[in-house]
Curated annotation (Swiss-Prot):
Keywords in alphabetical order: Cytoplasm, Gluconeogenesis, Glycolysis, Isomerase
The protein's name in its UniProt record: Glucose-6-phosphate isomerase
Positions of the catalytic residues: 346 (proton donor), 377, 506
The keyword Ribosomal protein appears for this protein: no
Cited HAMAP family: G6P_isomerase
Role this protein plays: Catalyzes the reversible isomerization of glucose-6-phosphate to fructose-6-phosphate.
Taxon lineage: Bacteria, Pseudomonadati, Pseudomonadota, Alphaproteobacteria, Hyphomicrobiales
Pathway assigned in UniProt: Carbohydrate biosynthesis; gluconeogenesis; Carbohydrate degradation; glycolysis; D-glyceraldehyde 3-phosphate and glycerone phosphate from D-glucose: step 2/4
């Protein structure tokens, strides 16, 4: 594998491979050769710094890295999350073919289908009004209380599928900052509000602190007996949930082979199901399952997750680009970059290989972004003219949901395509000067101004085009990126499915709480922490 990486570096260092403007000028078939389609989903990677030799080497790298074999281990239920001795089977949650999936020789599909059916029954009852609040009023607002994977996925997907909302209003509370829950409660009528507490262990400090506040809100307004009518839980800690006051028919479980950042397909998706209905939630699962089958069956050169992962690895470990920008040209995908940030950085932000040795080269990049066109008026300046090359990934639907605003959608499309073209083509010094002089500027002044209007170009980007952001399309897009992260993780030779980096800060916060409360001395902590504790204590009311 290392020899192939060295070949890639040697090939990429040649001008022919990385001069995108010249590559397009020399080959009018470049788009057709370096784009691939799955149903209506098109992936154009022709604006990446690749040629035929590089793509062939990347295909070879995938085989040498064992991506296909590891893929089968994941789908078949092997415990590839070896640091926690767990299978990785978010794919089973959307296994619409219902073929058996074995974990420890037990088919998990009956349990998966059972939870999905229970979710559907509960969601239908809330949506129809047959399941009411304590005072007999219909539920109008659903508040999901969770954090991390129990929040980012439902928030992102619920916003993305806003045109399909025909259920109660959805709200999401995650931050332990009391402002988050306080601002949400101000919007609610306790008689018509349902709270979903999403915590596998029912011990997550942020979630349980907010849950306690929500419980007081209901109990103080409606009485202790009302709690059971206004709460549901997504958890496996049945005893703790019962102690909270939530009845068993309002508890929806999931399994240790479902990682938090991969859990939107599970009962964690309950608020989404209530918002869009069980039928549309089923289509959401259908889209993900379609991508699962494509990932598992398509040849590497026609396989969107494979190609996306290979190019991501190439950008990170061959071209040494430390970051990638996620740029959906869809306002309803405004939380998609944050969702992918967790998916990618929590999965592949590792420094140790599966052998316990330091990673050679680099692991996952910094992932960030904002929807277009907003980002154009914020950070695109740096992407176009900054000293760092930042690979960009654009997403655009051919059709919106507002036919009366078709012209605005056409403007959106034009902006998206223009940005990817500008990143690739750039503008030479001669072109910049010619543009200035054509507007009447004197040569001497144009010579002075033109360098500031030069765009180097050769800034790589990938563009995804699809028909419309339906539940099916969103499920397919999320699954595409999940599998991309998997491919890169295999090539980085890391475990993409644990997250030990989250733990140390949690442990230290537990020890610092009594210090912040003034119950213990800060002695024993470093001088900076001691100084910060003292400064905050001095300002506290």
């Amino acid at each position: 594998m290392q020899a192939t990486i060295e070949k890639l570096k040697a090939t990429a260092s040649s001008t022919a491979a990385t001069d995108l403007r010249a590559a397009f000028a020399a080959d009018d078939q470049r788009f057709s050769r370096f784009s691939v389609k799955f149903d209506d989903l098109l992936m154009d990677y022709s604006k990446c710094a690749v040629n035929e030799e590089i793509v062939t080497l990347l295909e070879q790298l995938a085989r040498e890295g064992g991506v296909e074999a590891k893929r089968e281990e994941m789908f078949s239920g092997k415990a590839i999350n070896f640091t926690e001795d767990r299978a990785v089977l978010h794919t089973a949650l959307r296994n619409r073919s219902n073929t058996p999936v074995l974990v420890d020789d037990k088919d998990v599909m009956p349990d998966v289908n059972g939870v999905l059916a229970a979710m559907g029954k509960f969601a239908d009852a809330i949506r129809s009004g047959s399941l009411k609040g304590a005072t007999g009023k219909k539920i109008t607002d659903v508040v999901n209380i969770g954090i991390g994977g129990s929040d980012l996925g439902p928030v992102m997907a619920t916003l993305a599928l806003a045109p399909f909302h025909d259920g109660p209003r959805a709200h999401f509370v995650s931050n332990i900052d009391g402002a988050h829950i306080a601002d949400t409660l101000k919007l609610l009528d306790p008689e018509t509000s349902l709270f979903i507490i999403a915590s596998k262990t029912f011990t997550t400090i942020e979630t349980m602190t907010n849950a306690a506040t929500a419980r007081r809100f209901i109990a103080e307004k409606l009485g202790e007996g009302a709690v059971k009518h206004h709460f549901a839980a997504v958890s496996t800690a049945l005893d703790k949930v019962a102690a909270f006051g939530i009845e068993s028919d309002r508890i929806f479980g999931f399994w240790d082979w479902v990682g938090g950042r991969y859990s939107i397909w599970s009962a964690i998706g309950l608020p989404l199901m209530i918002a869009i209905g069980p039928d549309n939630f089923g289509k959401f699962l259908d889209g993900a399952h379609a991508m699962d089958r494509h990932f598992r069956e398509a040849p590497i050169r026609e396989n969107l997750p494979m190609l996306l992962g290979l190019i991501g690895f190439y950008n990170r470990n061959v071209l040494d680009y430390p970051t990638r920008a996620i740029l959906p040209y869809d306002q309803r995908l405004s939380r998609f970059p944050a969702y992918l940030q967790q998916l990618d950085m929590e999965s592949n932000g590792k420094g140790v290989t599966i052998d316990g040795t330091p990673v050679e080269g680099q692991s996952g990049p910094v992932v960030w972004g904002e929807p277009g066109t907003n980002g154009q008026h914020a950070f695109y300046q740096l992407i176009h003219q900054g000293t760092s090359v930042i690979p960009a990934e654009f997403m655009i639907a051919a059709n919106g949901f507002e036919p009366e605003l078709r012209h605005q959608h056409q403007l959106l499309i034009a902006n998206c395509l223009a940005q990817s073209e500008a990143l690739m083509k750039g503008r030479t010094l001669a072109e910049a000067k010619a543009q200035l002089t054509s507007k009447g500027m004197e040569d001497s002044q144009a010579d002075f101004i033109a360098p500031h209007r030069v765009f180097t170009g050769n800034r790589p980007s990938i563009t995804f085009v699809y028909d419309k952001l339906t539940p099916f399309a969103l499920g397919r897009l999320i699954a595409l990126y999940e599998h991309r992260v998997f491919v890169e993780g295999v090539l980085f030779r890391i475990n993409s499915f644990d997250q030990w980096g989250v733990e140390l800060g949690k442990e230290l916060a537990t020890g610092l709480l009594p210090v912040v409360e003034g119950k213990e001395s800060a002695a024993g902590h470093d001088s900076s922490t001691q100084g910060l504790v003292k400064a905050l204590a001095g300002l506290a009311g």
